[in-house]
Amino acid sequence: DYVGGLVGLNYYSTVSNSFYDKTKYTGDGVGNNPTHPGATGKTTQEMSYGGTFKNASWDIIADSSVTSLTPVIKWDSINNKYVWAIAPLALAYTLGDKTTTYNGTTQNLSTLYNNSTNIFGTNHSFIDLSKYKFQVAGNDVTGYKDADIYNNIKLVNDSDSFAILNASGNTDGKLIINKKDLTISNITANNKTY
């Protein structure tokens, strides 16, 4: 008997761009072919994110009226066809505090906050941070140069149609740029008065 996360036994058929939940089933995707390239194991969280399927060339849309955290078939009345639909993944973010020292150049927030695991948590390490941007008081911010404390840095979804950021429960960022110590050498003082 062959058991697989997606297909138990595959003879003379094609399996491509397909997924199974490796959190729920830890075996192979295709029972009689453990290295089959068409059946990829994804975590439960990855299976609830539409980008997983879109990146595999699925015709899928994010639809807030869908309550399923896995893709469902839905009629698209605008385009008169069936499509895959999935609820947008709700995410909370944690930016937290970052400290650096003035170096004469702009310190980019995308360099300081560059790890999706730290920002969205271990279960959402697959989120592409290039689809998000930073804002302060509703204005886009890419970085800061001068020594100062910069508070209330928020993460904003810029182009990820398969995720939404929660309105509450997020931890905004704070960037502290410390002054650089000044080193002075080879100075001669004239006209000294004591």
Question: Where are these predicted regions, by residue range?
Answer:
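Predominantly extracellular beta-rich ligand-binding scaffolds that present long acidic/polar faces
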Residues: 1-92
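Solvent-exposed beta-strand/loop surfaces, strongest in extracytoplasmic domains of secreted
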Residues: 75-81, 86-194
